[in-house]
């Protein structure tokens, strides 16, 4: 198994797909996806385009769907939800499909959707992702950060490092043997420095500051937890994620 970390979807190799792609958008899309599925959501379907989301979701009965839209950190007008995982309670999401479009996370998922296996990862479900990698041993693994509008993101890179760090620890293989690019080593180093204060890291991150200005402190606190959910969101058909416990 070789791990490759890409800081944004735009940095992934063109005309290639890996055996397993892991999309990361800690703040907040992949944290929300894991939360919805853990709370009993039927599925999460991701869209880059809001108009397409509305058109596809119209085919579903209102009682079986939820629409979540976020642009610039704020909720899209007319949608039931924004991108806060804390709004995704079992009472609201159980048995329903969440149709979601966000500024960054859904772009990363669209880029890798043709990979043989596509997973979503956040700190909250890191252990489930690592367990899958160790059990299945895919040959080439991309961990793709969502970034912010094409730019580097501290929190996504730290999460990529958290995954790689745990794979190294549990496989007892040296990092240089698992690392397919230098970004893996730097991501592990970033996570190692901040693993005991991820909330502090979020406060330094540009998107963390953006969410704090929107008074989303509790979201940051929730998303900074590690290994609190056992859910593994896995793509069942293009753009549609269901749980693998």
From Swiss-Prot:
Which cysteine pairs are covalently linked by disulfides here? none
Q: Which reaction does it catalyse?
A: (2R)-O-phospho-3-sulfolactate + H2O = (2R)-3-sulfolactate + phosphate
Cofactor or coenzyme needed: Mg(2+)
Q: What class of enzyme is it?
A: hydrolase
The record's annotation in Pfam families points to: 2-ph_phosp (PF04029)
Q: Does the keyword Iron apply?
A: no
Query: Which GO-annotated molecular functions does the record name?
Result: 2-phosphosulfolactate phosphatase activity; magnesium ion binding; sulfopyruvate decarboxylase activity
Q: Which UniProt keywords apply?
A: Hydrolase, Magnesium
The family classification in the record reads:
Belongs to the ComB family.
Question: Under what name is this protein listed?
Answer: Probable 2-phosphosulfolactate phosphatase
Organism of provenance: Nostoc sp. (strain PCC 7120 / SAG 25.82 / UTEX 2576)
